[in-house]
Amino acid sequence: MRVKVTLACTECKQRNYNTMKNKKNDPNRIEMKKYCKFCKTHTLHRETK
């Protein structure tokens, strides 16, 4: 079952990206290195509630 998730920057806490994840394959919160336009650098983004 795929669900929509929002990714937030760990530095500035801005919610920058929306994506889909498969809950069966990824039961935990996902983390990705993505570009944050507010920090103007690549930072770690975590799944939010």
From Swiss-Prot:
One of its GO terms (cellular component) is ribonucleoprotein complex. SUPFAM superfamilies: Zn-binding ribosomal proteins (SSF57829). NCBIfam families: PRK00504.1 (NF001764), PRK00595.1 (NF001860), rpmG_bact (TIGR01023). Belongs to the bacterial ribosomal protein bL33 family. GO terms for molecular function: structural constituent of ribosome. The lineage of its organism: Bacteria, Bacillati, Bacillota, Clostridia, Eubacteriales. Pfam families: Ribosomal_L33 (PF00471). This is Large ribosomal subunit protein bL33. It comes from Clostridium perfringens (strain 13 / Type A). GO terms for biological process: translation. Keywords: Ribonucleoprotein, Ribosomal protein. The keyword NAD does not apply. PANTHER family: 50S RIBOSOMAL PROTEIN L33, CHLOROPLASTIC (PTHR43168), LARGE RIBOSOMAL SUBUNIT PROTEIN BL33C (PTHR43168:SF2).
